[in-house]
Each structure stands twice: as C-alpha cells, then as structure tokens.
Amino acid sequence: KTRVYLHMRDWNNVVTEAKKLEGGRFILETNPATPFVSYKDNQESIFSIPNDSQDNASVNGAMSAMMSAREGGRAMCPTSPTLYNSKFWKGDDKRRNLVLYRASDDYYFCDKYQNPQTREEYAPILRYAEVLLNEAEAAARAGDKTLALEKLNQVRDRSLADPATQTYKASDFANTKALVEAILWERRIEFQGEGRRWEDIHRLAADDLLPSGGIPAKIEYNNVKNQGAFVVGGEVKAEWFGNSKQFIPYTDKRFI
C-alpha cells in the first residue's frame, strides 16, 4: 500500500500504512546483502517470487542469468557511472560489495543475484527497506523532516562503515528539496537491480520538487570502456551519453 499511496502522492496514508508494519514480523536486516544471499530465509523480504533450479529455471530464473556477471551470466544490465560515481554513495558503503567488476568489459554489474547457473534465487518484489524509504519520502514532503530523517538513516546507516560519523544530520539539508533528493538517491542505491527505478522515473515526471521530466538519457557502453569512468564521487561526462539513447520527455508519445 505504501508504494501505491506514494505514487498517488497521498503522503499521510503512506506514513499510516508504514506504521502498521512497525514492530511486526518484518525488520531491516543488519547486512544489506542478507535479503539476496539468504533469499529463502530472511526477515526483510515481504514478498518475493520463489525460483527453483528444477522448475523451469531457464525462464523463471532469467533475472540472475541476464544480470549477473559471474560465470554463466550474460551481464546484460551494467551499473551506470551515473549511479556508481554519485556523491550520495560513499566509497566504503557496504552495498558497493553488491556490484561486481568484470575486467573483460571494464564495467561494473549488479551482483545481487549470484547464481546464474542454477538460477534458483528468489526475485525480490517488496522489501521492508522500501517501506521505510517510502515513509521517509512521504514524511519529508508532508513537512515532518524529523521522521523523514529517522527513516532515511535507518536504511542508510546499516550500510555505512561508520554510522556514528557518517549518518545524516538535519543540518545536512538546507530545505525539503535537498532532503527529498537524498532520499531519492538512497532509493537508487538501495534498489539497484530490483526494478524500482522505472516507477520512480514515471511518478516523478512532473514532480514539484525534483521532476525527472521523462526518461533520462543513457550512457553508451562503448563511450566509457577504457575511459576510467567508474570513480567514486567522480564526474559523469556529457560525451558518454550516446545519440541512440537520448532523453525522452514526458510529453513524448512513447512515454506511457
């Protein structure tokens, strides 16, 4: 429900529904990798689609087969330098262990799904981390910056090398827009490779604070290979974006 209400911009109901899950069976695992390496047995996954190596795994388990850069994987979903280089993603963040560098491609790939040969991993649909970040964004937009910061830090801090010194403080954000921007970047980092990005692009197309404006331009693989493009906190160069993958405005007929 929090996901639906967030798309509807019904901030109060997002918070109300999120509160219903507090203190219940679902929690935020202490290690950000746990929902993926322990996909059958963790307390963070609210809803996942099970896969089995003996049950049509070639189709049902296509997620790991297509995304993984490990042996047997097709590595078709690389991590963009736009995300990898983001100032919001610290270099010692534990979630950087969930991206894998493959030298033959000179590229990083999402490594949440690590069994491309057996393809038995569960497909994550909804995790408690999303509930918390949905609540954080809704609270920020509704004017409750204290609650927003609490929920944002709850998700982010578990991945920090030193939460005591690296956690966000209220003084880090000059206004609501800055806080919401941090929450949106946290979503990109936390849900990389889980299919949440498109929904955010769509719902934020005409946003009052941080409009996506449409489908962002994409970086062309051949434009960054052997260019040293992946640098924590590094720049993202305009020439990396290819003509074949240009920005598509929200008004374009292809934007449904």
Residue ranges and their predicted role:
Residues 1-63, 87-256:
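Acidic/polar-rich alpha-helix caps and helix-coil junctions
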